[in-house]
Amino acid sequence: MDSFWFDRWREGQIGFHEGTPNSHLSQYAGELGPGKRVLVPLCGKAEDLVFLASLGHTVIGCELVEDAVKAFFAEHQLTPAITSHAHHVQYTAGSITVFAGDYFELTPGLIGGPCEALYDRAALVALPPELRARYAPHTRTLLVAHAPMLLVTFEYDQALMKGPPFSVREAEVREIYAPSAMRLLEERPDARRPELGGLDRSWAITL
């Protein structure tokens, strides 16, 4: 799976990248609360990082492909301070920090303590089922208790596209995050891939 993402970035096949802040985030960012340390797993070079920072949050991202991290800071004309760790390279500029490396090796100590909120548009849907089962428990170790989460998922007929992004059913979200309190904020047709007949969903979850 790791080689897949390195290949996609190297070949410029990044149709999953959104050039503007995600519409679910724009509408429901208030679910995260004010002035939080927000964890953004598998963040790529998402505009969402800048958007969250503009709202007064301190943003902690993690991205496997270091070239994507470099591209994010270069495209926003930010000159980051760079620190090498055992398994990650840390890039920090202002209120945005991104760790280049394996998300599953991220620790609370490395990121300066547990984060206070979570925004996930691209992480859960990027992982195959066997990794999704590991993702939620690991993510909880990086957060304070009862942290608010804004989650964006897609559901479509997996036979029509191999993924990633993978289809994540509503029932699976409820199973992965049980017994956390959760609300389905919105469900709408996936306008980016209408040929799949899929659904975009946004969730507010208290971890």
Predicted feature residues:
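Conserved acetyl-CoA-binding loop of GNAT-fold acetyltransferases
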Residues: 57
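A short acidic, Gly/Pro-enriched loop at the edge of an enzyme's catalytic core
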Residues: 108-118
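Hydrophobic, aromatic-enriched interface-forming segments
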Residues: 119-122, 128
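Gly/Ala-rich phosphate-binding loop of Rossmann-like dinucleotide-binding domains
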Residues: 53-54
